Swiss-Prot record:
Official protein name in the record: 2,3-bisphosphoglycerate-independent phosphoglycerate mutase
Cysteines engaged in disulfide bonds, as pairs: none
Catalyzed reaction equations: (2R)-2-phosphoglycerate = (2R)-3-phosphoglycerate
Species per Swiss-Prot/TrEMBL record: Salinibacter ruber (strain DSM 13855 / M31)
Gene Ontology process terms (BP): glucose catabolic process; glycolytic process
Pfam families listed in its UniProt record: iPGM_N (PF06415), Metalloenzyme (PF01676)
Gene behind this protein: gpmI
Organism lineage: Bacteria, Pseudomonadati, Rhodothermota, Rhodothermia, Rhodothermales
């Protein structure tokens, strides 16, 4: 490859373009550098949600989906659609791993446990998939009390007080199907940590295996009591639900114990790994625990290449991603993020590949150890900007990929002022890195992977903590290039970058090139 061709892809995670500036931290923040880029350089907008990124129509985008599409250079149809389609066409009920779990419980007169994020947010899971599992259990002949559901309440990708509605919806659906009952509730803050805060994971594990948590007679009361204490869905402390028939199957009918079967129905991997490790790894050292014997543990999708577990929906093998193409052509690349988004610029951007490509360097900066990021809205952006700027000066990379996590991670807290501060921190970091890149002869693309900080308030005035379906920016800086930049989707970014680098676009990338090829090559 031509060593003089260099490109920086800067991802402002959660930096959506607002419909209503009054509720947008992006619009209210003082961001002189990004504002300057809009004034001076060619730009367009990108679709980052729904069908354009392989999600159901109208479904908000997320970081996993966004980075997968960005790296693939095409629309990548996501697990949520694959699973939903399997339920619709009936193949779900013949899925080897799922049927095996149900039959394991039935054959040994043990329990089937279904656990996962309890919402229709569509980012980590979907309740329709849980209902599909209940139907499968019914078809396999499991008794009503033999199927326990452990709800990891959301409140991050959904309304913070939406849990009660989901519980009532579930109870109605379970009654219709004829199997399944809610056995425990805990917020995703505990059950779905991904930053090795093992004390959180341990509290969820103790609830599931020992029943350690406040006891309630019904799940609606359990959640309302949490709300009364000012604790919303994401942060609900462990709660077990009493059952009259608790000893009908096994010694403790709602707990996960020896001989049971578990289906973890989250389809997104990053926040499912820690709890899976606690249940399945013989040499686990995150905390002291007793591991149930003869436990069949099934995951909805592959959570980690190192897990030797039954998987219901294997990952699609994505070939010809941007990283793979550049590596095969002799290019060097850099992937950089803080902990919260490290998997996204590596595993997801590489199409589900854990290992670096030849010539790929990685920069990981630890995220701050705070309970929620509104307490430190700058997160680790200053250190990350320093590290990447230094790397760009010290090595020649064909492609550098950098993610600033702040607008997304702070946006999830619903704290408007903190989200404004997060956007301002990213503006400062972006200035530092972009100026360093331009000094070294890099062209630059500045984008976002989905919306979030563009809407921090609901119409009723309550905090909005979820992602949005907003369009996202696409700004290009390249000497001699004056545009235009056509509007497109995330899957168009990789072929556009290859064109800016003067490289051929592989057949596997069917995304569109959003710049005139002759002008990009000539600049």
């Amino acid at each position: 490859m031509d060593s003089s061709k260099r490109h920086l892809l800067l991802i402002l995670d959660g930096w959506g373009l607002a419909d209503d500036p009054s509720v947008s931290a992006v619009e209210q923040a003082d961001t002189p550098f990004v504002d300057h880029l809009y004034d001076e350089y060619p730009h367009g907008v990108l679709k980052a949600s729904g069908l354009e990124v392989g999600l159901p129509d109208g479904q908000m985008g997320n970081s996993e989906v966004g980075h997968t599409n960005l790296g693939a250079g095409r629309v990548v149809y996501q697990e949520i659609l694959r699973i939903s389609k399997a339920i619709e066409d009936g193949s779900f009920f013949e899925n080897d791993a799922l049927v095996r779990a149900a039959r394991h419980a039935k054959a040994s007169d043990q329990k089937l446990h279904l656990m996962g994020c309890f919402s229709d947010g569509g980012v980590h899971s979907h309740l329709e998939h849980l209902y599909g599992l209940l139907e499968l259990a019914r078809r396999e002949g499991l008794a009503p009390a033999q199927v326990n559901v452990h709800a990891f309440t959301d409140g991050r990708d959904t309304d913070p007080h939406g849990g009660v509605d989901y519980v009532e919806q579930f109870q109605k659906k379970a009654d219709e199907i004829g199997v399944g009952r809610l056995a425990s509730i805990v917020g995703r803050y505990y059950a779905m940590d991904r930053d090795e805060r093992w004390a959180r994971t341990e509290r969820a594990y103790r609830l599931l295996t020992d029943g350690t948590g406040a006891a309630f007679d019904d799940p609606v009361t359990a959640l309302k009591a949490s709300y009364d204490d000012g604790v919303t869905d994401e942060f609900v402390e462990p709660r077990r639900i009493r059952a009259d028939d608790a000893d009908a199957f096994g010694d403790h009918g709602t707990r996960i114990e020896d001989g049971d079967a578990v289906v973890y129905y989250n389809f997104r991997s990053d926040r499912a790994r820690q709890l899976t490790r606690a249940f399945t790894e013989a040499d686990f050292d995150g905390f002291e625990r007793e591991r149930p014997d003869d436990l069949l543990f099934v995951t909805m999708s592959p959570y980690d290449d190192e897990f030797d577990l039954p998987v219901a929906f294997e990952k699609l093998n994505l070939e010809g991603t941007l990283g793979e193409v550049l590596s095969a052509r002799g290019g060097r690349q850099l992937r950089a993020a803080e902990t919260e988004k490290y998997a996204h610029v590596t595993y997801f951007f590489s199409g589900g590949r854990e290992a670096p490509f030849d010539g790929e360097d990685r920069v990981l900066v630890p995220s701050p150890k705070v309970d929620t990021y509104d307490q430190q809205p700058e997160m680790s952006a200053p250190e990350l900007a320093d590290r990447v700027s230094r790397s760009l000066r010290e090595a020649d990379y064909t492609l550098a990929v950098l993610n600033f996590a702040n607008p997304d991670m702070v946006g999830h807290t619903g704290d408007f002022e903190a989200a404004v501060a997060a956007c301002e921190a990213v503006d400062r970091g972006a200035r530092q890195v972009v100026e360093a890149a331009r000094d070294q002869g890099y062209s630059v693309s500045i984008i976002a992977d989905h919306g979030n900080a563009d809407r921090l308030q609901n119409p009723d005035g309550s905090p909005h903590t979820a992602h949005t379906t907003a369009l996202v920016p696409h700004i290009i800086l390249k000497d001699g290039f004056e545009g235009p930049v056509r509007d497109g989707k995330l899957g168009d970014v990789a072929p556009t970058i290859l064109t800016l680098l003067g490289e051929d676009v592989p057949d596997a990338m069917d995304g569109e090139v959003l710049v005139p090829a002759e002008r990009a090559a000539a600049s």
